[in-house]
């Protein structure tokens, strides 16, 4: 018989309420042993919780959920008593004395919910993300993932891929049926539609990943542009040494901050110039390494220097050398010395913010800009949360879609296109964990009258 698991569902320590959760075939037996009866399904019952000698350990609310109508899909019993840890430990010890009961592993209740098709993998992960959410936006987005918004988008993509595979494999396996879908433009049009759909989901998932894991912001620029002063201003403390000596920062400095609950990883780097010694050279190499891994780059300019007044000169010196796929915000620092007013404008496709890191003038504008860059929305109607593994799976799927497009349009290779689509489907299924090869087989026989 399958084991029954039990664990404390509330955080350890003192509290108003403490909850033990039991899941498995012996949940009813636990109820009769500890409560003297099993409550009616989905009905709260106020009862004493007793030890093996019949002595009352505590009294509280008991809830019973009969399979499959429970979180795990199994029989579930919840005992909600007072939040004293000693009482909860005694009650847990009593339950574990029963044969066939064991302590649950971390996350095992959610695992059972997944195995019993109550949740897919993305939804199960969203439970942890909801618990760990550091902002209202993150919590709402995690809830949307838990409710299946991300999974639904992935499943729609999978359905589209299966539909296309159905046609392609029919053309390969049943040529006598005069199904020659590779000969017209319908397959390519449908493939292009899937590529477009996937690009939209990838964009949303990347935003959701930043919201969950934090945006990596790298401060870059010439020496003595005020990069370390900006790090200190954003961090709200003296995290970096600031002097008038160019090249003070030799190594990478990191600060983890929150703006209205939105997590940011701020990276201060060595000034970009021709190195004067080996230590500075190593620091500059590390700076470029951080730049290449950034989610956003803050390019610091000294607004008192004449060369920085011309954006074209800045473009030739810095912007053309920065990774083209990473968004760049130009920060004109030292407004207190140049006499410029704080402000934010769009110029030649770049956001340009004028501020003074020393006096904090304009820092609020930068904070708001970074917050909006992470997807912060005042109406809290943002999308779903996503993890790095989701992004990797979507990236792999996109790669194989593009390879499939090449096989179709350049080589007219139906077998290779079908193989690329199979790989796309497998990578997408890694997100939800719901794919089986029987899905495709059933689709072929139900969609076509082969042999008619």
UniProtKB/Swiss-Prot annotation:
Protein residues bound to Mg(2+): 228, 249
Binding of (6S)-5-formyl-5,6,7,8-tetrahydrofolate, residues: 21, 78, 118, 452
GO CC annotation terms, alphabetical: cytosol
EC number, UniProt record: 3.6.-.-
GO terms for biological process, alphabetical: tRNA methylation; tRNA wobble uridine modification
Location of this chain's protein in the cell: Cytoplasm
Cofactor note: Binds 1 potassium ion per subunit.
Primary location group: cytoplasm
Binding positions for GTP per the UniProt entry: 224-229, 243-249, 268-271, 333-336
Stretches of the chain forming a coiled coil according to its record: none
Superkingdom of origin: Bacteria
One Pfam family of this chain: MMR_HSR1
Family of this protein: Belongs to the TRAFAC class TrmE-Era-EngA-EngB-Septin-like GTPase superfamily. TrmE GTPase family.
HAMAP family: GTPase_MnmE (MF_00379)
Subunit annotation: Homodimer. Heterotetramer of two MnmE and two MnmG subunits.
UniProt xrefs under NCBIfam families: mnmE_trmE_thdF, PRK05291.1-3, small_GTP
Designated name of the protein: tRNA modification GTPase MnmE
Gene: mnmE
